[in-house]
Amino acid sequence: MTDPLASGFALFETPIGVCGIAWSPRGILGLQLPEATAGATRARLRRRWAGATESEPPAGVQRAIDRVLELLAGGAVDLGDIPLDLETAPEFHRKVYEVARTIPPGQTMTYGEIARKLGVPHESREVGQALGRNPVAIIVPCHRVLGADGKMGGFSANGGVATKRRILEIEGASAVGAGPLFERLK
Protein backbone atom coordinates (compact mmCIF):
# COMPACT_ATOMS: atom_id res chain seq x y z
CA MET A 1 0.00 0.00 0.00
CA THR A 2 1.22 3.50 -0.83
CA ASP A 3 1.87 5.89 2.06
CA PRO A 4 -0.81 8.63 1.74
CA LEU A 5 1.72 11.25 2.91
CA ALA A 6 4.28 10.43 0.22
CA SER A 7 4.44 12.72 -2.80
CA GLY A 8 2.03 11.43 -5.39
CA PHE A 9 -0.11 12.30 -8.35
CA ALA A 10 -3.46 11.28 -9.78
CA LEU A 11 -5.53 11.94 -12.88
CA PHE A 12 -9.18 12.96 -12.75
CA GLU A 13 -11.88 13.60 -15.34
CA THR A 14 -13.31 17.13 -15.58
CA PRO A 15 -15.70 18.98 -17.93
CA ILE A 16 -12.63 20.31 -19.78
CA GLY A 17 -10.78 16.98 -20.04
CA VAL A 18 -8.49 14.79 -17.94
CA CYS A 19 -6.57 16.89 -15.43
CA GLY A 20 -3.83 15.80 -13.06
CA ILE A 21 -2.90 16.79 -9.54
CA ALA A 22 0.38 16.32 -7.68
CA TRP A 23 0.87 16.65 -3.94
CA SER A 24 3.36 16.50 -1.09
CA PRO A 25 2.80 16.28 2.66
CA ARG A 26 2.69 20.13 2.71
CA GLY A 27 -0.01 20.60 0.08
CA ILE A 28 -0.79 20.62 -3.61
CA LEU A 29 2.35 20.86 -5.76
CA GLY A 30 0.62 21.18 -9.08
CA LEU A 31 -2.58 20.99 -11.03
CA GLN A 32 -2.08 19.98 -14.64
CA LEU A 33 -4.73 21.12 -17.08
CA PRO A 34 -5.63 18.61 -19.81
CA GLU A 35 -3.13 17.72 -22.49
CA ALA A 36 -4.27 16.21 -25.81
CA THR A 37 -4.70 12.79 -24.15
CA ALA A 38 -4.81 11.36 -20.62
CA GLY A 39 -1.49 9.66 -21.38
CA ALA A 40 0.08 13.01 -22.27
CA THR A 41 -1.27 14.53 -19.03
CA ARG A 42 0.22 11.61 -17.06
CA ALA A 43 3.57 11.99 -18.88
CA ARG A 44 3.66 15.73 -18.11
CA LEU A 45 3.06 15.03 -14.40
CA ARG A 46 5.80 12.36 -14.36
CA ARG A 47 8.29 14.73 -15.99
CA ARG A 48 7.47 17.65 -13.72
CA TRP A 49 7.34 15.72 -10.44
CA ALA A 50 9.67 12.80 -11.15
CA GLY A 51 9.68 11.65 -7.51
CA ALA A 52 5.89 11.41 -7.27
CA THR A 53 4.11 8.10 -7.79
CA GLU A 54 0.66 7.68 -9.28
CA SER A 55 -1.69 6.73 -6.47
CA GLU A 56 -5.09 7.27 -4.91
CA PRO A 57 -5.26 10.82 -3.55
CA PRO A 58 -5.35 11.20 0.24
CA ALA A 59 -8.54 12.67 1.73
CA GLY A 60 -7.34 16.30 1.69
CA VAL A 61 -6.27 16.05 -1.94
CA GLN A 62 -9.55 14.36 -2.86
CA ARG A 63 -11.41 17.29 -1.26
CA ALA A 64 -9.37 19.67 -3.42
CA ILE A 65 -10.22 17.62 -6.53
CA ASP A 66 -13.92 17.67 -5.60
CA ARG A 67 -13.86 21.45 -5.23
CA VAL A 68 -12.05 21.90 -8.57
CA LEU A 69 -14.70 19.68 -10.17
CA GLU A 70 -17.47 21.76 -8.60
CA LEU A 71 -15.87 24.95 -9.94
CA LEU A 72 -15.50 23.47 -13.43
CA ALA A 73 -19.16 22.43 -13.32
CA GLY A 74 -20.11 26.10 -12.89
CA GLY A 75 -20.16 26.40 -9.10
CA ALA A 76 -18.94 29.63 -7.52
CA VAL A 77 -16.34 27.82 -5.43
CA ASP A 78 -13.53 29.65 -3.62
CA LEU A 79 -10.37 27.53 -3.78
CA GLY A 80 -8.30 30.07 -1.85
CA ASP A 81 -7.94 27.92 1.25
CA ILE A 82 -6.60 24.77 -0.44
CA PRO A 83 -3.11 24.16 1.02
CA LEU A 84 -0.35 24.56 -1.55
CA ASP A 85 3.30 23.52 -1.54
CA LEU A 86 4.99 26.31 -3.48
CA GLU A 87 8.27 26.08 -1.59
CA THR A 88 10.32 25.95 -4.80
CA ALA A 89 8.59 28.94 -6.45
CA PRO A 90 10.42 32.29 -6.34
CA GLU A 91 9.16 34.68 -3.66
CA PHE A 92 7.77 37.18 -6.19
CA HIS A 93 5.78 34.40 -7.88
CA ARG A 94 4.32 33.32 -4.54
CA LYS A 95 3.21 36.92 -3.87
CA VAL A 96 1.56 37.11 -7.30
CA TYR A 97 -0.20 33.80 -6.63
CA GLU A 98 -1.48 35.07 -3.27
CA VAL A 99 -3.12 38.07 -4.95
CA ALA A 100 -4.51 35.96 -7.81
CA ARG A 101 -6.11 33.59 -5.28
CA THR A 102 -8.25 36.50 -4.03
CA ILE A 103 -10.02 36.92 -7.40
CA PRO A 104 -13.51 35.40 -7.04
CA PRO A 105 -14.93 33.04 -9.66
CA GLY A 106 -16.63 34.95 -12.47
CA GLN A 107 -14.47 38.03 -11.95
CA THR A 108 -11.19 39.10 -13.50
CA MET A 109 -8.25 41.34 -12.75
CA THR A 110 -5.51 42.68 -15.02
CA TYR A 111 -1.79 42.01 -14.78
CA GLY A 112 -1.36 45.70 -14.01
CA GLU A 113 -3.89 45.60 -11.16
CA ILE A 114 -1.98 42.73 -9.55
CA ALA A 115 1.28 44.64 -9.98
CA ARG A 116 -0.25 47.70 -8.29
CA LYS A 117 -1.59 45.58 -5.41
CA LEU A 118 1.96 44.29 -4.91
CA GLY A 119 3.34 47.84 -4.89
CA VAL A 120 5.25 47.37 -8.16
CA PRO A 121 3.01 49.18 -10.66
CA HIS A 122 5.50 48.97 -13.55
CA GLU A 123 5.99 45.21 -13.33
CA SER A 124 2.84 43.90 -15.03
CA ARG A 125 5.02 41.95 -17.47
CA GLU A 126 6.75 40.21 -14.55
CA VAL A 127 3.32 39.39 -13.10
CA GLY A 128 2.44 37.78 -16.43
CA GLN A 129 5.66 35.78 -16.40
CA ALA A 130 4.96 34.54 -12.87
CA LEU A 131 1.43 33.49 -13.86
CA GLY A 132 2.82 31.79 -16.97
CA ARG A 133 4.83 29.56 -14.63
CA ASN A 134 1.93 28.89 -12.26
CA PRO A 135 2.14 25.19 -11.32
CA VAL A 136 -1.36 25.09 -9.80
CA ALA A 137 -3.66 26.46 -12.49
CA ILE A 138 -7.32 26.72 -11.43
CA ILE A 139 -6.34 26.72 -7.72
CA VAL A 140 -4.23 29.81 -8.41
CA PRO A 141 -6.68 31.18 -10.98
CA CYS A 142 -4.29 32.61 -13.56
CA HIS A 143 -7.12 32.25 -16.09
CA ARG A 144 -8.87 35.15 -14.30
CA VAL A 145 -6.03 37.55 -15.09
CA LEU A 146 -6.36 39.57 -18.28
CA GLY A 147 -4.25 42.04 -20.17
CA ALA A 148 -4.97 45.74 -20.28
CA ASP A 149 -8.43 46.67 -21.56
CA GLY A 150 -9.72 43.14 -20.93
CA LYS A 151 -7.54 41.47 -23.57
CA MET A 152 -7.18 37.74 -22.99
CA GLY A 153 -3.38 37.79 -22.92
CA GLY A 154 -1.61 34.46 -23.05
CA PHE A 155 -2.25 31.12 -21.42
CA SER A 156 0.42 28.46 -21.16
CA ALA A 157 -1.89 25.43 -20.84
CA ASN A 158 -2.64 23.10 -23.74
CA GLY A 159 -5.17 24.87 -25.94
CA GLY A 160 -3.80 28.28 -24.97
CA VAL A 161 -6.24 31.17 -24.92
CA ALA A 162 -9.13 28.90 -26.00
CA THR A 163 -8.72 26.94 -22.75
CA LYS A 164 -8.57 30.18 -20.74
CA ARG A 165 -11.71 31.42 -22.50
CA ARG A 166 -13.54 28.14 -21.83
CA ILE A 167 -12.77 28.20 -18.10
CA LEU A 168 -13.83 31.85 -17.86
CA GLU A 169 -17.03 31.01 -19.72
CA ILE A 170 -17.79 28.20 -17.26
CA GLU A 171 -17.34 30.73 -14.44
CA GLY A 172 -19.57 33.31 -16.14
CA ALA A 173 -16.85 35.98 -16.33
CA SER A 174 -17.24 39.22 -18.26
CA ALA A 175 -14.46 41.09 -20.03
CA VAL A 176 -13.29 44.21 -18.25
CA GLY A 177 -15.26 47.14 -19.65
CA ALA A 178 -16.57 45.18 -22.64
CA GLY A 179 -19.79 43.51 -21.51
CA PRO A 180 -20.16 39.76 -21.81
CA LEU A 181 -16.84 38.14 -22.69
CA PHE A 182 -18.52 35.41 -24.69
CA GLU A 183 -21.37 37.19 -26.37
CA ARG A 184 -22.53 35.04 -29.27
CA LEU A 185 -23.22 36.45 -32.71
CA LYS A 186 -26.86 36.10 -33.73
Functional labels for PLM-detected ranges:
Residues 121-131:
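Short, positively charged loop/turn segments that connect secondary-structure elements
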Residues 88, 131, 156-159:
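Structured beta->alpha junctions
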Residues 1-122, 170-186:
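Basic nucleic-acid-binding alpha-helical/helix-turn surface characteristic of O6-alkylguanine DNA
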Residues 144-146:
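Short, basic, alpha-helical segments at the C-terminal edge of helix-turn-helix-like DNA-binding modules
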Residues 133, 139:
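Major-groove DNA-recognition helix of helix-turn-helix-type DNA-binding domains
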Residues 148-186:
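…primarily DNA-binding HTH/wHTH and HhH modules…
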